[in-house]
Design a protein with these regions (language model features):
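Long, charged amphipathic helices and adjacent flexible linkers at domain junctions
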Residues: 1-3, 115
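Compact, glycine-rich, soluble single-domain proteins
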Residues: 3-5, 10, 14-16, 20-95, ...
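Well-ordered alpha/beta subsegment
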Residues: 92, 99-115
Length: 115
């Protein structure tokens, strides 16, 4: 039997920009994507710890080391700049998956890895 399992998690990241005029997606610095094992174009679930909103979109790699997490398109109406979010990606597997999880500070720097 196949199961949908958490494979990647960026916890407590902070949205720096919300741009409703962009075509869509969430832009995440490529160094954070790599640390969490999220691929360019991968479907992600984004939840807001600040206001409780949640949505699905796809990940777009941003400039590494900038700390800029940008909500684009319609998603920017749901989750806004300054909100603390969790970004998750999932895998379908017949076997257990050990997720790559990172925790960020308010500057979107990795402060802890949970594995």
């Amino acid at each position: 039997m196949q199961h949908v399992l958490l494979k990647s998690k960026i916890h407590r990241a902070c949205v720096t920009v919300a741009d409703v005029d962009y075509e869509g997606s969430i832009e995440i610095p490529s160094d954070l994507m790599e640390a969490a094992g999220i691929w360019e174009g991968e479907r992600v679930l984004v939840t807001s710890a600040s206001k409780g909103g949640r949505l699905e979109t796809y990940a777009q790699a941003g400039e590494p080391g900038t700390g800029k997490i940008i909500m684009n398109g319609g998603a920017a109406h749901i989750i806004k700049a300054g909100e603390r979010i969790t970004i998750m990606a999932f895998a379908i597997s017949e076997n257990p998956v050990l997720p790559k999880k990172i925790v960020c500070n308010e500057l979107n720097e990795v402060i802890r890895r949970i594995n």
